[in-house]
Amino acid sequence: MAHKKAGGSSRNGRDSAGRRLGVKKFGGQEVVGGNIIIRQRGTRVYPGANVGMGKDHTLFALAEGRVRFHAGKLGRKYVSVDMMAEAAE
């Protein structure tokens, strides 16, 4: 009597789609208010001047200007939007 389990019972074979996280606007790029700068899980990068943070930790521009990444205290990374002279006029 053959004792063999029926085939086709693999418990693998699932995967979820990538979440499209990462930097969307890089340093030196121009942004307008509302532009998403970074999509992230947790605060890998903190909001600086003229940058807001959504409930899912997305960083977005609050004003028109140029994106700038910089280091802060405690080794934290920050992203700010520097207002440009022509944008202020």
Curated annotation (Swiss-Prot):
Gene Ontology molecular function terms on file: structural constituent of ribosome
One Pfam family named in its UniProt record: Ribosomal_L27
GO BP, sorted A to Z: translation
Keyword DNA-binding attached: no
Keywords, in A-Z order: Ribonucleoprotein, Ribosomal protein
CC per GO annotation: cytosolic large ribosomal subunit
Region (Disordered) location: 1-21
Claim: Protein transport is one of the keywords in the record: no
Entry-linked Gene3D superfamilies: 2.40.50.100
Coiled-coil regions listed: none
HAMAP family xrefs: Ribosomal_bL27
Entry similarity comment: Belongs to the bacterial ribosomal protein bL27 family.
Protein's name in the database: Large ribosomal subunit protein bL27
Gene that produces this protein: rpmA
